[in-house]
């Protein structure tokens, strides 16, 4: 199910059960803990122009519906604040299934392999991390606001690292 809400920075592709409160960070039918997400969860990155990604989303939606791909999101606009001129599609999965997901992606002409773990992503969004700092630069925040954003990001992300046995909870985006 493609969710294209213009108020969101992203277009999402979810299984309908996710909209009923189910998690998409699941492996073999079991919701993942924070430690499992840090160890196994990640995403394939696919770069492209928005119209091409919209077409690709239509083709990948059935794989999400069949639970072969857990979730996909992609940029509504290129993330210029991160130095990119193309949109990024993030095709999420457990690394133990990433080869199968990669085979699906290659059916649609995707050749560039770029895998990023959720741990790496979280580290880049921690206080001082490159993604958080670039994003704040693009927002033009004053130092007091930057400090508050860093504190909030640190609290959210540190919680995942500090509570390994809790069921992982995603953040609203």
What are these regions (language model features)?
Residues 1-173:
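Structured alpha/beta or helical-core interaction and ligand-binding surfaces enriched in interleaved
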